[in-house]
């Protein structure tokens, strides 16, 4: 007899909750991909003589002995030099070395996880890079996590008073303030602390929000409230980042701007390979390596 996919003792409606979360992540993926393709069509500034980019979707399954898979959607265009919008739903058992790091996994190593992950590296250095992900994880416990953060690549724009950063933070603050289960000040600080390159003593970007292990008490709305907040994070991102791109994507840039962008991308590589929790989680749970490492920029420079 096959072992059950999940530990015993979970809520009776856990399968309905899993299905709802998975459906939302996939719907958000389609919404964002359509929005980014529309932006590709709208470019009139530098490089507008190039063809507009389109996403190429590739489904994948986990390696033999593991369960689940996902869809990797990649685009290389005239606005987005490289952008990936990925969804995955995976299940199996955590390795012994990983169990102590995941809530509920030390009691039973079985897990289920579903989520969306996005990273965009624009062509124009005036357009900030961005990252967003949200996820639901089930072990003997279950919770939501995720966030969104902005990375301007020009030093003169890596300030908290820059209009793009102000707009991005305001969008995340509004999303948080709509939900009693969310704490914007806490999530903003968590983002600043998480997306920090310790070996260089500098932040990766200008921040956003980051949250994990969100499992609210029933009196606050429980799972439904956490899921509603997680959906609003995705909706807020899908509105604010295209607006930021449209504000900047037709602006001219210099060779110095491009060099600055490539150096800043190098910092992005350093963070993702040294510190990023999602990268480590994916590689240690039999995730799709191509999808996991697709967050890395196409061209970088170390001075």
Curated annotation (Swiss-Prot):
Region Important for dimerization: what ranges?
268-303
One GO molecular function term?
metal ion binding
* GO terms, biological process: protoporphyrinogen IX biosynthetic process
Which UniProt keyword terms apply here? Answer: Cytoplasm, Heme biosynthesis, Metal-binding, Oxidoreductase, Porphyrin biosynthesis
Query: How does this polypeptide assemble, per the annotation?
Result: Homodimer.
- UniProt pathway: Porphyrin-containing compound metabolism; protoporphyrin-IX biosynthesis; protoporphyrinogen-IX from coproporphyrinogen-III (O2 route): step 1/1
Active site, per annotation? 131
SUPFAM superfamilies to which the protein is assigned, alphabetical: Coproporphyrinogen III oxidase (SSF102886)
Please name the source species.
Answer: Rhizobium meliloti (strain 1021)
Of the GO CC terms on this record, one is:
cytoplasm
This enzyme's EC code(s): 1.3.3.3
Q: Where does substrate bind?
A: 117, 133-135, 286-288
Lineage, top ranks: Bacteria, Pseudomonadati, Pseudomonadota, Alphaproteobacteria, Hyphomicrobiales
Compartment(s) of residence: Cytoplasm
Report disulfide bridges, numbered on this chain: none
Summarize the protein's role: Involved in the heme biosynthesis. Catalyzes the aerobic oxidative decarboxylation of propionate groups of rings A and B of coproporphyrinogen-III to yield the vinyl groups in protoporphyrinogen-IX.
Protein's name in the database = Oxygen-dependent coproporphyrinogen-III oxidase
Cofactor(s) needed: a divalent metal cation
Q: Which residues are listed for a divalent metal cation binding in this entry?
A: 121, 131, 169, 199
Site (Important for dimerization) location in chain:
199
Reaction(s) this enzyme catalyzes, per UniProt = coproporphyrinogen III + O2 + 2 H(+) = protoporphyrinogen IX + 2 CO2 + 2 H2O
What family is this? Belongs to the aerobic coproporphyrinogen-III oxidase family.
């Amino acid at each position: 007899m096959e072992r059950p996919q999940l530990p015993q003792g979970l809520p009776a409606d856990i399968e309905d909750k899993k299905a709802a979360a998975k459906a939302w992540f996939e719907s958000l993926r389609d919404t964002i991909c359509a929005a980014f393709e529309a932006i590709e069509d709208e470019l009139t500034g530098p490089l507008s003589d190039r063809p507009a980019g389109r996403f190429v979707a590739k489904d994948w399954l986990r390696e033999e002995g593991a369960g689940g898979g996902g869809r990797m959607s990649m685009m290389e265009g005239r606005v987005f030099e490289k952008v990936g919008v990925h969804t995955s739903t995976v299940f199996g058992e955590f390795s012994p070395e990983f169990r102590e790091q995941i809530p509920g996994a030390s009691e039973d190593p079985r897990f289920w996880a579903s989520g969306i992950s996005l990273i965009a590296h624009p062509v124009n250095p005036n357009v900030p890079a961005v990252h967003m992900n949200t996820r639901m994880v089930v072990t003997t416990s279950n919770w939501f996590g995720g966030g969104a953060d902005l990375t301007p690549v020009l030093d003169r724009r890596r300030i908290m008073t820059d209009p793009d950063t102000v707009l991005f933070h305001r969008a995340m603050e509004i999303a948080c303030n709509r939900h009693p289960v969310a704490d914007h000040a806490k999530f903003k600080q968590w983002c600043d602390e998480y997306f920090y390159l310790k070996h260089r003593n500098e932040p990766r970007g200008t921040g956003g929000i980051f949250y994990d292990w969100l499992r609210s008490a029933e009196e606050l709305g429980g799972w439904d409230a956490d899921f509603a907040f997680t959906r609003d994070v995705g909706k807020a991102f899908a509105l604010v980042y295209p607006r930021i791109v449209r504000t900047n994507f037709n602006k001219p840039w210099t060779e110095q701007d491009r060099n600055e962008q490539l150096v800043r991308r190098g910092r992005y590589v350093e963070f993702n390979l040294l510190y990023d929790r999602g990268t480590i989680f994916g590689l240690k749970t039999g995730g799709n390596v191509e999808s996991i490492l697709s967050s890395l920029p196409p061209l970088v420079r170390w001075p």
